[in-house]
């Protein structure tokens, strides 16, 4: 079974370089992803491949989870892949989140996918996540990518890239 699922997709009225400024700076993620409370980098240098940080997120019952994250792929204006471990994942488990951007005329198509293959979640839990996501968000129109689209198209300036 395929354990990667699309959780967000949007056509954003901006060039990929502007969209990338939002996606590539994790300290700005809480502005458009309500599940994220705080990002704490392990180093002051700007984000790049290998950049590591701690992420505090709230998933259910107002309980905060802390996880470690690292950028495993960082292709400017094209693709960002983040590996996250810890939190309420089983020990040794991790997920990959991918933000893929591509230019389409005068817009950017942004797609967010989550790969649960290495999460060490029980089979039925993974199945439930994939099933429910496909049932209620098969188009990818819901979620935090939609929030990012609204911020960009409303003219909110992106967070400053650190470093």
Predicted regions and their residues:
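Generic structural detector for well-ordered beta-strands
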Residues: 9-13, 40, 70, 100, ...
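Short, surface-exposed coil-to-beta transition loops
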Residues: 5-7, 64-69, 92-97
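Beta-strand/loop substructures that line and gate deep hydrophobic ligand-binding cavities in soluble
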Residues: 84-142, 159-161
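Alpha-helix N-cap/helix-start motif
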Residues: 22, 32, 64, 90-94, ...
């Amino acid at each position: 079974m395929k354990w990667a699922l699309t959780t967000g997709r949007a056509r954003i009225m901006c060039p990929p370089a502007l969209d990338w400024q939002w996606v590539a700076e994790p300290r700005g993620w809480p502005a458009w992803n309500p599940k994220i409370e705080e990002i704490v980098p392990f180093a002051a240098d700007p984000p790049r491949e290998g950049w590591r940080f701690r992420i505090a997120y709230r998933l259910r019952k107002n309980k905060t989870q802390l996880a470690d994250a690292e950028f495993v792929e960082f292709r400017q204006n094209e693709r960002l892949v983040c590996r996250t471990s810890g939190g309420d994942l089983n020990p040794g488990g991790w997920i990959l989140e991918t933000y893929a951007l591509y230019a389409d005329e005068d817009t950017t198509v942004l797609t967010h996918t989550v790969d649960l293959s290495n999460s060490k979640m029980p089979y039925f839990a993974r199945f439930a996540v994939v099933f429910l996501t496909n049932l209620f968000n098969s188009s990818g129109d819901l979620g935090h990518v939609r929030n990012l689209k609204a911020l960009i198209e409303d003219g909110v300036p992106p967070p400053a890239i650190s470093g």
